[in-house]
Amino acid sequence: MQEHYQPAAIEPAAQKKWDDARISNVSEDASKPKYYCLSMFPYPSGKLHMGHVRNYTIGDVLSRFKLLNGFNVMQPMGWDAFGMPAENAAMKNNVAPAAWTYDNIEYMKTQLKSLGFAIDWEREVATCKPEYYRWEQWLFTKLFEKGIVYRKNGTVNWDPVDQTVLANEQVIDGRGWRSGALIEKREIPMYYFKITDYAEELLNDLDKLEHWPEQVKTMQRNWIGKSRGMTVRFAVSDDSKQGLEGDYAKFLQVYTTRPDTLMGATYVAVAAEHPLATAAAADKPELQAFIAECKAGSVAEADMATMEKKGVPTGRYVVNPLNGDKLEVWIANYVLWGYGDGAVMAVPAHDERDFEFAAKYNLPKKQVIAVGDNAFDANRWQEWYGDKENGVLVNSGDLDGLDFQTAFDAVAAKLQSQGAGEPKTQYRLRDWGISRQRYWGCPIPIVHCEKCGDVPVPADQLPVVLPENVVPDGMGSPLAKMPEFYETSCPCCGGAAKRETDTMDTFMESSWYFFRYMSPKFSDGMVSAESAKYWGAVDQYIGGIEHAILHLLYARFFTKLMRDEGLVNVDEPFERLLTQGMVVCETYYRENDKGGKDWINPADVELTFDDKGRPVSAVLKADGLPVVISGTEKMSKSKNNGVDPQELINAYGADTARLFMMFAAPPEQSLEWSDSGVEGAHRFLRRLWRTVYEYLKQGGAVKAFAGNQDGLSKELKDLRHKLHSTTAKVSDDYGRRQQFNTAIAAVMELLNQYDKTDTGSEQGRAVAQEVLEAAVRLLWPIVPHICETLWSELNGAKLWEAGWPTVDEAALVKSEIEVMVQVNGKLRGKITVAADASKADLEAAALANEGAVKFMEGKPAKKIIVVPGRLVNIVV
C-alpha cells in the first residue's frame, strides 16, 4: 500500500474496476428489490457547474447505499438537449445548434465520469435525437386524434424586427432582448394540451405523495388553483349593444369566488381583446390607443400582477342581476383575455386591487361586508375588508346579516332562478400551449392541407426529422424558410400540403424521459411493457426547487396521459422527491465608468479577516486595490462567482469534491462555498488513508472480529459499541433521513474513538479490522474511490459485493454506563455503574462520589432523584 493518498492515481483505477465489473449496468431482475434513483438531467450547456456536482452526488450516494443493501439499482443519465441557449450560441459562434450540443454532451459526459458516478451509460438518452423524439411525436398524434391536443389562437410576444415570437423572459422593459424593438402582442395559431381535463386528479393525487416536500405540494396546489365560485351574467344595457353579436350582445359573463359581494359591485372590467372593448373602441381613438398599449404589454401573468394598473371607461353599461344597478364597463390592463371570460366584476370595498383602481379613477366604493364593530373608511384599505370568514352582509337588502356560505347559497339560488348565473368550480391552471416558433426543438407532427385541414403524421412516417445542419440568424423561423422541410403531401388525400413549422416546448421532452430510461433502445414504442412494469415509478427523484411547478407538474400530467394510453401502470412518476439547495459563494465587484458593476471572481480576491474570522476588506490580487464585498449569492456566470468543478477535481480529486458537497450542509439547504471547507475535506481523506496505512503497517490485515465479545476489554467493547451505534445511525441518515452531513460526522467520531483506543493486542487488531472495514463501507457511497482502494488493501475483495455493514445488537448493549451526579441540580461528578444497576445502587454510588461528597459539605441528603441511565440529583 502506498504511504500517501494520491487521488490522481487511485480514482481512474477504481473507475476502471467498476466499469470492467459493470456494476452500474442493470437489467430487470425479479430476484432483487428494484431501486430507481434519478437526478434531473442537465441541459448540455458546455460545462458542469457546482450545482450539477451537488445534485448528482446526492443521487450517487443514495444509489450506492442501496446497491450495498442488495437492491437492483438503476441510475441513468441523459441530456435535455433542445432549447434556446443552443440557438443563441449558434448565432454567436456561427455554428449549427446540433454540433454545439453534441460537443457539449461529450465534454460534460467526460466530467461526469471523472466524478465516479455509478451511472448506467448504456441507458443514455439525448432528447434532440430522432430516435427519442419520434415517440414524443407519436404520443402527440394519438392525443391530437383524441382531442386532448387541440389548436386555437394564442397571444404571444412578437418582435417586429426579428420577426419572431419571444418568451416572456426575453421581453425586457417591453422591448426585445436582442433587437430592442417595442414588443407587440399577436394572436397566432398554437397547439395546446388539455391539462385542465386532469386538474382535479393532479390536485387530489398530491395527497398520495407522502415523501414530497410539503412546500412543493403547496406550490402545485396554488398553481392548479381550484376555487369554488359562480358564473354571473350581467345583462348588456339596451343602449350598449351596438357592434355586439350573439351572446355578447345579451350579457357580459364573469366568474367570481365572492358572489356574496355582488351587491357591492360598482363597475366591471374587461380585457383589451374582449368583443365589448372592440365594439366600444370602433369610433373612439382614445380607446383604440389604450387597447394597442395593452396589446403591446407582456403576456406574463407575473408581470400583470406587479405592473401599474390602468384603465379607460368604455361608455358602455351592464346591469347587476341582483339589484338592477347599471355598472360602467372599463377596459383594464390587468384583465387577461386568455383567463376565464376575460372579464371581472369589481367590488372596490372588498378587493384590494379593485380598491386601488377605484381610488385612482375616483370610482365608487360600496361596503357590503361588516366585521364586528370595525369602521369602514373609503379612503384607506384595511385588511378586514377582504375577510370572508368573519364577515356578514350589510347594505344588501334581504341578504343582510348572512355569513359568507349562507349568502353564497342565497345568491346562487336567486341567480339560477333568473338564468343569470350558476355555481362553478374553476381552476387557475390553464391548458398548456406547447407551440414554439423556434428551430431547435421537436417538430410538431402535423400537416396542413387546404382540403383535409390539420392532419397528424401517420405513425409509419414518424419521426418528422429536424434538419440538423441549420445555423439560425435570429430572424423568424428557419423551418418556415425551408421548402425542403415544409413542402409535403397530405397523408389523407395525397394533395400538396405544408408541414407545421413550429416546434414543441422543451418541457415536453423532460415530461417523460424517466420512462424512456427504462428501455432506451426499445424501437416499438415509448417504453416496453415489461420494463415499465418492473421499474414502475422513480423511487427517488432529485432536483432544484425551481422546478417545483412546471417540470414536476408536466411530468405528473404526462404520467397520467401515458397511463391512460396503457403505456405505464403508475399514477405518479416520482415516489420520493428531494429538492437540494443552491450552491452559493461570495461575490465581489468594482463600479465601472458607466455606473454598472464589474464582477470579480473570488479566486482573484485577497481578503482581510477580523479576530473572529469574518472578512472585513478585500483587494484585487492583480493590483492590490479595494473591491466591494457584496455578500453570498447563487453561483452564476452573471456574478462571476462560480468555481469550476474541473479545477477542484484536478487539485484535490473527485472524492474531495463529493465529500465537501455532502458535508458542508444538509442537502435541502443552500451550501456556501468555502475553500477552507474543501481543504478540510481533503485533510480528512488523507487522515483516513493514513489510518488504514498505519494499521496495515503494524502487521497486515487480519480476520475482522465477529462473535461473542464477553472476553474483550471494556475499552474494546466501548469501541465496538461506538462502531455498531454509528452503523445504525449512518444507515438511518442515508436511508430515512437523507442527511449525509451527519452520517459523515458520525464516521469521523468513530475514527476519533478508534484513534484513542489501544488495539495492539490480537483481539484489538480483530476489532480494529472490523472498525476499518465498516468505516470504508459506510463512507463508500460518498467517497467511493478511496474506500474501494482501502477495502482492497484491507480485505482483498470487491467492496461493491461486500454488502452493507450489519449491526451487532449485542454490541449495542453496554454492560456499564456513565451516569451524571448532581448536587442541587449542578453537575458535580460522574459515576460508572452496571447497566442494570438498581435505584439503591445508583443512590449509593452517587453518595460515595468524590465530587458529591465535597459539595454536600457534610449535610444530609433531603431527597435523591434518580433518572435511570442518565443522572442522580442529590438535594441537600
Swiss-Prot record:
Keyword set, alphabetical order: Aminoacyl-tRNA synthetase, ATP-binding, Cytoplasm, Ligase, Nucleotide-binding, Protein biosynthesis
Keyword Metal-binding carried by entry: no
Entries under Pfam families matching the protein: Anticodon_1, tRNA-synt_1, tRNA-synt_1_2, tRNA-synt_1g
Enzyme Commission designation: 6.1.1.4
Positions that bind ATP: K637
PROSITE patterns noted in UniProt: AA_TRNA_LIGASE_I
Primary residence: cytoplasm
GO CC annotations on file: cytosol
Recorded superkingdom: Bacteria
The protein's name in its UniProt record: Leucine--tRNA ligase
